[in-house]
Regions:
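Phosphodiester-processing cores and adjacent nucleic acid-binding clamps
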Residues: 1-160
Length: 160
């Protein structure tokens, strides 16, 4: 099918998100193409384990891949999309900090002073007004309340 939709699903989990996703990166790419999408983001929970596999599968099939992650903390979650290689490197650093620190705080990690621009190359989407305020206070712009239509990419059975 020829890609016709300008809609881009951003909150997509593969089986790399244990208990949250069941599809392989290849199956996600195939389903996106069946739905007429031209682009798809893979945003597994707290990891990038299958990012390269997804990226390669998408490029092979002519789908524009977006890489990102859903970073979760005890109180909040943020959907982070990489804009470029620098963003991917910064997301890797954030995920490392998240894994090493049980009290990880996204706003503090993005505002740290040991790295000049920890949020460079990243789009940060949050639903929590508190997290959005913390990010803005730290000088990090965040999009708030961005929603998808859940039926747009899901099949009749609700899955990809």
């Amino acid at each position: 099918m020829i890609a016709t939709s300008s809609f881009v699903p951003l909150r997509v989990h593969s089986h790399g998100s244990l208990l949250y996703g069941v599809a392989s990166p290849e199956a996600l790419v195939e389903r996106a193409l069946e739905q007429g999408l031209h682009s798809l983001a893979l945003t597994d929970r707290d990891n990038l384990y299958l990012a390269v596999r997804f990226y390669q599968a998408a490029l092979t099939e002519g789908l524009q891949p977006l890489l990102g992650c859903l970073i979760t903390t005890r109180d909040h979650e943020a959907l982070i999309i990489c804009v470029d290689r620098r963003g991917f490197a910064n997301l890797c650093e954030l995920l490392t900090a998240r894994m090493l620190n049980p009290r990880f705080d996204l706003a503090s990690a993005l505002a740290r002073t040991d790295t000049a621009t920890p949020a460079a190359g990243l789009h940060i989407i949050v639903e929590s007004p508190g997290l959005a305020a913390s990010l803005l206070q730290a000088g990090i712009p965040a999009a708030r309340g961005v929603r998808e239509e859940p039926h747009s990419v899901r099949g009749a059975d609700g899955g990809l």
